[in-house]
Amino acid sequence: MRGDYRGLYRCGGQGLATVLRGLLACGLVLLLWLGLPGEAAAQLHRHADENGVAVVRSLESLRDLDYQTWQLVAYRQGPPGGPLLLRIVGYPGKVRLDHPTALLVSSGRSSWQLSDLTLANPQLAGDGRSAAAEFDLAPLLADLQQNRPLRLRLPGVFTELPVPPFVVMEWRSLPTAPD
């Protein structure tokens, strides 16, 4: 009878070693997977506008705290050092944006008030849907030292629109991004 137990023990020992090796392999795969940087949803895109001027932009759709979706387009026109703008677009018919209305931005104890430049853009100024607004992004980007989350507030339109750190990181890369 003892021989039967020894054979079972040997077989179980080999089975246990196989299971442990499998668990170790799964653990290593999991660690490698978690250690790799994830891809962000937003990306910098490069193209030329209708006048042939180089444009570098970050495009992201985000929801405010009332679950309304907004498209945020941060872009730079021309070579590095060119104008930096943030366009916020709502769905036509659902929202009407009055101009000029400053965009209020906060992060921790810091806050900014971005100037409304919508009426300076002939395309947006002539758009009867009034579903878009454009703001000067340069003062915000000049002050940001980290990729911290931001909270946007547009009085009379939305009370809070959270902007995640990966989007802030892309916005911060706009001033120096190659054409």
Predicted region positions:
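Short, surface-exposed binding/anchoring microloops in extracellular/periplasmic proteins
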Residues: 68-104
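Boundary at the C-terminal end of the N-terminal hydrophobic targeting segment
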Residues: 40-44
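Short, solvent-exposed, Trp/other aromatic-anchored flexible loops in extracytoplasmic proteins
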Residues: 109-158
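Low-complexity, acidic Ser/Thr/Pro/Gly-rich terminal tails and inter-domain linkers that flank the onset
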Residues: 45-79
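A short, compositionally biased
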Residues: 52-58, 97-101, 143-149
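Bacterial N-terminal signal peptides
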Residues: 12-35
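Short beta-strand elements
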Residues: 162-179
